[in-house]
Amino acid sequence: RQAAKGLSEALRHREARKVYWAAVAGVPNPPAGTISYGLVKGSGHGRQGEGEKMQCIHPDAISSTEGAKRAVSDFMVLSRLANRGAWVALVPITGRTHQLRAHMAEIGNPIIGDGKYGGSGQQNLGDGWGAQFGGDISKKLHLHARYLKIEHPFEKRIIEIKADLPSHMARTWKTFQWDLAESPNDPFIDEGL
């Protein structure tokens, strides 16, 4: 129980390193960088706020936008499918709700399968990425917590956890011929970012 509490605290205080993998529509340009748009909760359409989503706020407007919070994400293209799609590694420097999803959509490369932030093109109906990829890709969100590095709360040793891709993403990687062996656990460390 205390170990779980210690791990929760480490995550809350940003003492953990989390690397996510995503398949995105298009290819980010530049192929690596930092997204610093703030986030503010937009109103939903349902009675209880259902359907609400985070809206990106330009960094210069964060302090003057009520409810806006600073949000920072690093990204790096690991592989690409011409200009149609890319395998991207993502690290949330801050930990805001839907941060990675909103940030990737904001730079014009929404995560495949993200109906909330990617728009109607994410429904794989023959427009948007569905047409680009031939309609063979799962409609599920293509975002995966791939790697976690954290210090054990009592033993003070480093724990590293690597999670396999979920089946729908593994099929996409196979379809696009993206080789999992091409990527280190944390490409940002290996690239000096």
Positions of predicted regions on the chain:
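RNA pseudouridine synthases
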Residues: 1-193
